[in-house]
Amino acid sequence: MEKTYNPTSIEQALYQTWEEKGYFKPHGDTTKESYSIMIPPPNVTGSLHMGHAFQDTIMDTLIRCERMKGKNTLWQVGTDHAGIATQMVVERKIAAEEGKTKHDYGRDAFIDKIWEWKGESGGTITKQLRRLGASVDWDRERFTMDDGLSNAVQEVFVRLYEDDLIYRGKRLVNWDPKLHTAISDLEVENKDTKGHMWHFRYPLADGVKTADGKDYIVVATTRPETMLGDTGVAVNPEDPRYKDLIGKEIILPIVDRRIPIVGDEHADMEKGTGCVKITPAHDFNDYEVGKRHQLPMINILTFDANIRGAAEVFNTNGEPSDAYSTELPAKYHGMERFAARKAIVAEFDELGLLEEVKDHDLQVPYGDRGGVVIEPMLTDQWYVRTAPLAKTAVEAVENGDIQFVPKQYENMYFSWMRDVQDWCISRQLWWGHRIPAWYDNQGNVYVGRTEEEVRKNNNLESVIELHQDEDVLDTWFSSALWTFGTQGWPEQTDDLKVFHPSDVLVTGFDIIFFWVARMIMMTMHFVKDENGKPQVPFKTVYVTGLIRDENGDKMSKSKGNVLDPIDMIDGIDLESLVEKRTGNMMQPQLAKKIEKNTRKTFENGIEAYGTDALRFTLAAMASTGRDINWDMKRLEGYRNFCNKLWNASRYVMMNTEEQDCGFNGGEIEYSLADKWIESQFELAAKAFNNHIDNFRLDMASNTLYEFIWNQFCDWYLELTKPVLWKGTEAQQRGTRRTLITVLEKTLRLAHPVIPYITETIWQSIKPLVEGVEGETIMLQALPQFDEANFNQEALDDIEWVKAFITSIRNLRAEYDINPGKPLDVMLKAANAEDAARLEANKQVLMSLAKLESVRVLAADEETPACATALVAKSELMIPMAGLIDKDAELARLDGEIKKTHGEIKRIEGKLGNEGFVAKAPEAVVAKEREKLEGYKETLAKLEEQKKTIAAL
C-alpha cells in the first residue's frame, strides 16, 4: 500500500476496471431474489449538481448492499430528453453562433441539430455519474427518445385514446408567450408583486338602476386589458346591493357589447366592489364561472400576448360561435398586452368611467424557464383524464403496496391526487415525442401508431391528404413510463418479469406530483401481473430533502452559491471557481456580489477531497426528508476519516504481512481485546444493516464512523501493541489473525458507502486472509450479525479497561501531569469482579496508561492525598506527592479562575443589557447564554481542583 491515501491516483482507473469487467450487471441467476432501482433520468442537457450527487450516493449505497447480499441487482440508468430545456439550449446556441432561429432551419433540420448537439454534449452527465462511483449497468443505458421508449410512448397514447382517457379540447392553459408553448401549473412560479386595482364603471343597459339609484356598477380588476374579452359580470346572489340586477345587462365600454349580470358564489361580497368582470378566455376562475352560466369565450390575444386584429368567439364547448362580434377597436390591434393595459385605463379615464385606482399586492405568474408573465390562453390541447387513473393510484398507497419514506409525504400525495385536474400533455415545441394524431383537410382527427395504420383503420385513400399534429408530448408523459418502458414494454420481456416492479424510487419532494404520481397512474393502468392485478412501479418512494448552502439558502446560479460535486472530488482554484460562478449569468449585475462572497467563503479555492469523502459526507447528512445545509468542515472531517482508515490498514499490513496469522496451524490464543473487537464488529454489522433497511443512511454512516474511528483505530489498534510487542507466539497469532480478519470484514461493511478506498485496501490484504476469493470486493458478501462471534463479557470487560485508561488520561490533563511520566496507581475495588479485571489486564493498563505500578488497595489500607476518579463503582487513585509543584499549580489555577470570573462577568453584563437582548437575533442571545453556562461549569471544576491541590 502507498504511504499516503491519494484518491486521485486510484479512483478513475478502478472505476474503469469495474465497468470493463461487468461487475455492475445483474448476475442473471433468476433463482435468486432480484432487486432493482430505476435512476430518475437527469436532463440530457445538464451536468451533475449536489442534488444528483446526493441521490445517486443513496441509490448506489442501496444497490451495492443488495448486490453484496447475492441478489440479482439492476440499477437502470438513462437520461431524459427534457423538451423545453434542451430546445432552449440549442436555440440559444444557434442564435449566438449563427444568428439564426429554429425557423431558419425548419423543423426536421432543427431536430437534427438537437441530435447533433446531444451527441457532443449529452455525455457530460453520464461521465460525471461515473466519477461518483455509480454502479449502474451502462450496457442498458436508455434515453427517453430512443426507439424502444418512443414505441412505448406511442403505444400508451393510442391505448389511452382508445380507452377514452385522452381527448382533445379547447381549454385554458398556462401559456408562455416567450417560449410559445403551454406549460404545466407546476412550472409556474407565482411572484409577490406590488400592483394596482383599477375600479371601472360599467353602464347598466335599458335604463336599469342599482338599489342606490346609480345607472352603473363598479367592477374592480388587476388586468384592465382583458376587459375587451368580458362576456359577463358576476355578483353574489346573496348580495342585497345587486341581487335584483341578476339577469339584467350592462353595455361594455369601448366595445359596446351587451353582456349579462350573473349570480355566482365566485363574487365575494366583502372583496373589492362585490362585482367581478368575467373573461372566460383569459382567467382560470372566470373560465369556470363562464361554463356554469354558458357565457361565450372571447379570445383577444395572439400567442405573443398582443391584442388580436379580430377576436375569436367560442361557446363553452370550444366551438366557434356567432354570439358576439369578433370586432376589436382598431387602435388596439397588435398592441403589446401591457401597453394595451395603459391605453385602456387612459380611455376609461377620458370617458369618465375610471372610478379610482388603489395600490394592491398581488401574485403574478411567471414561467420558470422563459421568465415572462404567463398568460391564461384558450388553445386546442390534448388532455389525459386523470380522475379514473388516480383512483387506483391512491388505493396503492392506502393499502401499503407503495410506501413513502418518510411517511408524512403520503399526505402530500393524497391531497394532490384527490383533487387532481386533467393533465394537459401537448406542448408547442419541436423537440420531443410528436403526438401520433393526423388531421384531414376537414379537420377530422385520427389517432394511430403510424400514418399507414391510420389510413388502414379508417379506410382513407391515399388521395386524402393527412398531416400529423405539430405538437409534442409533455416530457413528463414519457418519463411517466420510465420503470416499464425501459424494460421492453409493450413486449412481455424477461426483464419486465424479473425487475418490475422496482424496489425503491429515490426522489425529491418537489417532483412527487410532476413525476411520482404520474408514474404510479401510468404503470398501474398498463402493467398487470399474471393474475391481472395492476403492478406498482416501485414498492417504496424514498423522499430526500434538498441540499442547501451553508446558510440554508437554496443553491442557484443567480445566488452564485452552487457547488459542483466534481470540484469537491478534484479540487478547484479560487480564480476558476469565481469564473465558474460569475460567467454566462442571466443577471450579470449580480456578478460582483457573487465574486465577493465566493472569495470570502473559499479564500484558497476548494481542495481535492476525493469521491469517497464526498459520498460519506452525503450519506452521513441523509436524515430522511430533511433539507441539508452543506458543510465543508464535515467534508474535511470525513476526508480525515478516509485517511484514518488508510493508515490503520497500513498498520495492520505492517504487522501481518509475511507474519504468522494463525492460518497455517499452530496454537492460537485470543486476547480479551480480540474478542471485544469481534463483538463490536458484530454490533456494527447488525446496526448498519438495520439502518440501511430503514433508509437511515445517516445512522448507517455514523455506525461505520464510530466503529472504525473510535473502536477499531483509537482503541483496538492500541490494545494490540502490548501483545504484538510482548505476547506469546499463540497470543500474537490470535491478535494478527483478528487484526486482518476484522479489517477485511470492516472493508466489506463500509464498501457500499466508500467503494474506492475499500476496494483498494481489500485488494492489498486479500492474499493475507484465508478463504477470501474473488476478483472484487463488490461481489463479496455484506457482513451480517453472527451470534457465534459475539461475546458480551468481553464487551463489558473492555469497556471497564477503557474507562480506567480514560480516567488516568483525564486526571493527567486536569492536574497538568506530564503525559509520559510513569505513575503509581491504586484501585479501591468495589467488588471482586473489578479486582479480577485489574489483574487480568494489568499488562495492557500499564502499557496504555503509562503506569509504573498498579495494584488493588487492601480493605483497611490508609491512603495518602490522591487525585481520584470513579471507574464503574470502584475508585481509581493517583498519589499526588512529588508529582506536581504545588505552589506553581495553585498559582496556575488562580490565574485560570480569575480569567473565568472575568468571562462570566463580561457575558452577564451583556445579557443584563436590555438593548442587546431586545435587538440581537435570538440565536446570538441563546449562544451567549450557552457560553455563560459553560464558563460556570469550568469555574466549578477549577475550584474543586484547587481544593484538592491545597489539601496535598
UniProtKB/Swiss-Prot annotation:
Coiled coil, from the record: 888-952
List ligand-binding residues for ATP: K557
SUPFAM superfamilies associated with the record: Anticodon-binding domain of a subclass of class I aminoacyl-tRNA synthetases (SSF47323), Nucleotidylyl transferase (SSF52374), tRNA-binding arm (SSF46589), ValRS/IleRS/LeuRS editing domain (SSF50677)
Function field:
Catalyzes the attachment of valine to tRNA(Val). As ValRS can inadvertently accommodate and process structurally similar amino acids such as threonine, to avoid such errors, it has a 'posttransfer' editing activity that hydrolyzes mischarged Thr-tRNA(Val) in a tRNA-dependent manner.
Q: Where is the motif 'HIGH' region annotated in this sequence?
A: 42-52
Give the multimer and partner information.
Answer: Monomer.
Q: Which domain of life is it from?
A: Bacteria
A GO cellular component annotated for this chain's UniProt record is:
cytosol
What protein name is recorded for this chain? Valine--tRNA ligase
UniProt GO molecular function = aminoacyl-tRNA deacylase activity; ATP binding; valine-tRNA ligase activity
Supply the EC number(s).
6.1.1.9
Tell me which InterPro entries the record gives.
aa-tRNA-synth_I_CS, aa-tRNA-synth_Ia, Anticodon_Ia_Val, M/V/L/I-tRNA-synth_anticd-bd, Rossmann-like_a/b/a_fold, tRNA-bd_arm, tRNAsynth_Ia_anticodon-bd, Val-tRNA_synth_C_sf
Know anything about its domains from the record? Answer: ValRS has two distinct active sites: one for aminoacylation and one for editing. The misactivated threonine is translocated from the active site to the editing site.
Q: Which cell locations does it reside in?
A: Cytoplasm
Motif 'KMSKS' region positions after renumbering to this chain: 554-558
- Please provide the record's keywords in A-Z order: Aminoacyl-tRNA synthetase, ATP-binding, Coiled coil, Cytoplasm, Ligase, Nucleotide-binding, Protein biosynthesis
The organism of origin for this protein: Vibrio parahaemolyticus serotype O3:K6 (strain RIMD 2210633)
Instruction: Report the sequence similarity comment from the record.
Output: Belongs to the class-I aminoacyl-tRNA synthetase family. ValS type 1 subfamily.
Question: Reaction(s) catalyzed by this protein?
Answer: tRNA(Val) + L-valine + ATP = L-valyl-tRNA(Val) + AMP + diphosphate
Query: By its UniProt entry, which Pfam families does this protein fall under?
Result: Anticodon_1, tRNA-synt_1, Val_tRNA-synt_C
Q: Name one process (GO BP) from the record.
A: valyl-tRNA aminoacylation
